[in-house]
Amino acid sequence: VENAQATDGRRFWWWLGGALLVLVVVLVSAWTWVTVRGDGRAGHVVTGSADDLREATFVLLDGADVVRLRTDDLGGDAYRVSTSRDSGVRPAVSLADGNILTSLRGTGQDGPAIVEVVLHHSVRWHLRLGGGAKEQHLDLRGAQLGDVEFTAGASRIELTLPPAEGTQRTVLSGGANQVVVRLAGDAPVRVRAGGGAGSVTVDGSTQSGVAGGTVLTPPEWESATDRYDIDATSGVSSLTVDRTDGDG
């Protein structure tokens, strides 16, 4: 009798362990489908739940032909990254220490690598774009924004920033041909041309042949509570900083 009871006990635990294993496999498979594979019928789409997320860093690890990034109300999602069905790349996302790491994987298709990124407007975002691109267009006028950094080269960068809260810092450490930064409101802006520039235009005033290490600082910048700080640590051909009305 005791042997029979022991055998039944072992069978129960084997059955329970097997059931738990199946459950884990199902959950992992579901997570992989939603956050990595996406819905191929509408292109390659990756989303992730916002839950109680208040602040995060979005990192793009790989290069693309074109990167377009903006903020919007995504409901229950914190982010959405997508490429077209025929794109040569598809996004894959992993999470590490509060960083949303986005890589681009080959699809075998010959379509352009155009990456669309939408981030939830209620989350405070820090952005780090690597890998380089022909064009990068970031419309952040409605964002809650921390630092923005471009760590790889680009042919053209267009960056629209929200009104400054504290010191809004943008770093261009990868070099670029043309950079256009649009600021909302009248907060003062400091521009560093650490790597030199063919030309720098700030609020309509242009300097040509700008030497590396040049810093353009208006008198009111040091004492301002809300201000912009643009640091081009690598060389650029043309850097233009102008203003928007802040309303889009």
Regions found by a protein language model. Name each.
Residues 1-14, 23:
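Terminal targeting segments of Actinobacterial cell-envelope proteins
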Residues 9-11, 27-29, 121, 217:
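Acidic, low-complexity intrinsically disordered regions
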Residues 14-16, 32-34, 126, 222:
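Short linear interaction motif-like sites in intrinsically disordered regions of transcription factors
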Residues 15-31:
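Hydrophobic membrane-insertion alpha-helices, especially the h-region
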Residues 33-103, 114-122, 126-128, 135-142, ...:
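Short linear S-[DN]-x-LW-Φ motif typified by the pepsin-like aspartic protease active-site region
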Residues 84, 111, 158-248:
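Short, surface-exposed interaction patches in beta-rich subdomains
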Residues 105-110:
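FAD-binding FR-type
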